[in-house]
Amino acid sequence: MEPITVTAEADVFTCNVYLVDGETTTLVDAGAMPGVERVIAEHVDDLDQVVLTHQHGDHVAELESVLSAFDPDLYAYAEHPHRTHSLADGDEIQIGDEACEIVYTPGHADDHVSLIGESALFSGDVVVYNDGAFDDGSFGRTDRPGQSRERLIESLETILQRLPESVTAMYPGHGDPFDAETGGETVRAVIERALERAERREPKYPE
């Protein structure tokens, strides 16, 4: 699996948006970068589906543009006017050429899911990497209304319980993708460090 970060050149605040070509060409989140649909079109002619990790504005602001341009199916945990398929914990969904398990991971958002495949984890905002808070593994913020550090800690533990040892890459909602081959450690180690920091009740952004 080789996702393309189609928001890599964004000059506005947005999540990372990943395009995965293959048997089921998939966009993970839609982001908030105007013109994202044009960047997608530079890489693929058709888009089969959009899968949302959650529905915060930085993940869905440009969803309408993507849906209008490609008319893909829309998968989401929470209700959405354009949702064609609901997601539930334990579901399996094809991302590119790889089957991924849907893992319900609330804490940062009540509707948050992560996607775990054989080789890759799409962690959304539950686990992030090199995002300006900590360079080597951190967690999404939990200080806003409706968010919960306790639930996020449980979600990190759930990911660790269900993460295959074969996963060597992590694609977070913010920061940089992580690859074990170049990162010098495992995806599991990055998540464990994020969990340790969350359990110490460290603030998301240290002073």
Report residues per predicted region.
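Flexible, charged surface loops at secondary-structure boundaries
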Residues: 19-22, 44-45, 164
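Conserved beta-strand hairpin/beta-sheet module of binuclear metal-dependent hydrolase folds
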Residues: 1-40, 114-130
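Residue-level detector of beta-strand structural context in well-folded domains
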Residues: 16-18, 85, 90-91, 113
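Histidine-centered catalytic micro-motifs
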Residues: 50-60, 104-111, 170-176
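Structural motif
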Residues: 24-26, 49, 98, 119-120, ...
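Metallo-beta-lactamase
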Residues: 33, 110-198
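Active-site HxH/HxHxD metal-binding segment of metal-dependent hydrolases
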Residues: 10, 30-99, 189
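Haloarchaeal acidic low-complexity proteome signature biased toward cell-envelope/secretome components but also
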Residues: 1-13, 42-43, 87, 152, ...
